[in-house]
Design a protein with these regions (language model features):
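RNase H-like, Mg2+-dependent phosphodiesterase core
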Residues: 1-178
């Protein structure tokens, strides 16, 4: 398991520069054939770190669910937005992802001083820092990735019950050999 302090490099540098409310934003659902793109923006307290936080793809499902509850409870502010297939088809997946991220950020109950984003450029009224592979390098982005992943997975589990013939319980909307 990665020590959560290893994910604090960017946040610590920004704190030293005087930034207080550091927002991480991430998305899930850009690659699947079905289901929404889901984006979460989160501002975490940086003096009370949650051990186990990491890129959602590197955390087991059970651990993600536990971390989700802790992140949502401890967050200074958190907001999740999902865009459905109609919105994605209307805009294209890249533009839908950017708009979804923007809406997640703009819906926060606390204004961020700076937004850390996983490599995309966003049109928002806040200073941004793009970090390639940010969900694996930034505590704030990793926290957002966990909340977004659990939220989307829960939605896809509901869809699996409603439409069992599509196998969403096993594939979460991603293409498989099945």
């Amino acid at each position: 398991m990665v020590d959560v302090n290893e994910l604090m490099q960017y946040e610590r540098q920004l704190q030293e520069q005087g930034y207080k409310y550091i927002c991480g934003v991430d998305e899930v659902g850009r690659g699947p054939l079905a289901g929404p793109v889901t984006c979460t923006a989160v501002i975490m307290p940086l003096d009370d770190l949650i051990q186990g936080v990491n890129d959602s793809k590197k955390v087991s499902k059970n651990k993600r669910i536990k971390l989700y509850d802790i992140i949502v409870e401890k967050a200074i502010a958190v907001n999740t937005v999902s865009y459905d297939n109609k919105k994605i088809d209307e805009m294209n997946i890249l533009e839908a992802t950017k708009a979804c991220m923007r809406d997640a950020i703009m819906g926060l109950s606390v204004e961020p001083d700076i937004v850390l984003v996983d490599a995309l450029k966003l049109d928002i009224p806040y200073k941004t820092m793009g970090i390639i592979k940010g969900d694996a390098l930034s505590y704030s982005i990793a926290s957002a990735s966990i909340v977004a992943k659990v939220t989307r997975d829960r939605f896809m589990e509901e869809m699996a019950e409603k439409y069992p013939e599509y196998g969403f319980a096993n594939n979460a909307g991603y293409g498989t050999a099945q």
